[in-house]
Amino acid sequence: MAINVIINGINGKIGRVVKENITAQSDLELVSGTGRQDDLAKTIQTTHADVVIDFTTPQSVFHNAEIIIQSGARPVIGTTGLTLEQIALLDKQCRNKKLGAIVAPNFSVGAVLMMKYAKEAAHYFPDVEIIEMHHSQKIDAPSGTAIKTAQMIGEMRSSKKDEPFKDRARGEIKNGIPIHSIRLPGLFSHQSVIFGSNGETLTIRHDGMDRNCTMPGIFMACRKVMELDYLVYGLENLL
């Protein structure tokens, strides 16, 4: 039986790409698409949606996720902006409802592997900085992927305070790691994690060329979320 899917944010840039690609997935049925003016809860109920893919805005994503869970569907969220406290609250709601949810700062499998390898490298290289580069329309900085990468690396290191540099050009500190953000036309989605040690450096880099790079991860999440009864944060936890 096919999984009934709603795309929330269907008129957005990535929502349109998901719509174009989902028809090729024989086990996923697009039953509706919603936007800012639509009643999401009512749409979930009338379409009997199993999964809602959310690519909306940082301002609305937490409210959207609560609506999805309370309406009995499973959120697959690619919208950035959720805090760790909000993610914990959503996980509690999922467990109460026995519903799965997936929140991923990046649905690109390549980007997730980059984060995974960076975490492994942190065993051997204590000094690291992150450079993330995106198109000029990207709203948030640092990116959700960069913040998640810093969190994963931070798990392998002794605790470091997020004390800001006196010189702001040295970047914003997350989990004790400097992050540098670049926003320019001509870029899409790029991140380098640069480790340094005596006499050597190690760079782990991912380049996303367009939004199609996220499609395999999004559709994998739609399938995996049906097997869960709690929230999973990060696509790396599904690989």
Swiss-Prot record:
EC number: 1.17.1.8
Record's keyword annotation contains Magnesium: no
Binding site for NAD(+): 9-14, 78-80, 104-107
Positions of (S)-2,3,4,5-tetrahydrodipicolinate binding: 135, 144-145
GO MF annotations, alphabetized: 4-hydroxy-tetrahydrodipicolinate reductase; NAD binding; NADP binding; oxidoreductase activity, acting on CH or CH2 groups, NAD or NADP as acceptor
Active site: 134, 138
Pathway named in the protein's UniProt entry: Amino-acid biosynthesis; L-lysine biosynthesis via DAP pathway; (S)-tetrahydrodipicolinate from L-aspartate: step 4/4
Keyword Cytoplasm: yes
Gene Ontology terms: cellular component: cytosol
Entry's Gene Ontology BP terms: diaminopimelate biosynthetic process; lysine biosynthetic process via diaminopimelate
Family annotation (CDD domains): DHDPR_N
A Pfam family that the UniProt record links to this protein: DapB_C
Domain of life: Bacteria
Gene3D superfamilies in UniProt: Dihydrodipicolinate Reductase, domain 2, NAD(P)-binding Rossmann-like Domain
Broad class of the protein's primary localization: cytoplasm
Record localization: Cytoplasm
Keywords noted in UniProt: Amino-acid biosynthesis, Cytoplasm, Diaminopimelate biosynthesis, Lysine biosynthesis, NAD, NADP, Oxidoreductase
Protein task: Catalyzes the conversion of 4-hydroxy-tetrahydrodipicolinate (HTPA) to tetrahydrodipicolinate.
Protein family (similarity comment): Belongs to the DapB family.
PANTHER family the record matches: 4-HYDROXY-TETRAHYDRODIPICOLINATE REDUCTASE 1, CHLOROPLASTIC-RELATED, DIHYDRODIPICOLINATE REDUCTASE
UniProt xrefs under HAMAP family: DapB
Protein name: 4-hydroxy-tetrahydrodipicolinate reductase
Organism, scientific name: Coxiella burnetii (strain CbuG_Q212) (Coxiella burnetii (strain Q212))
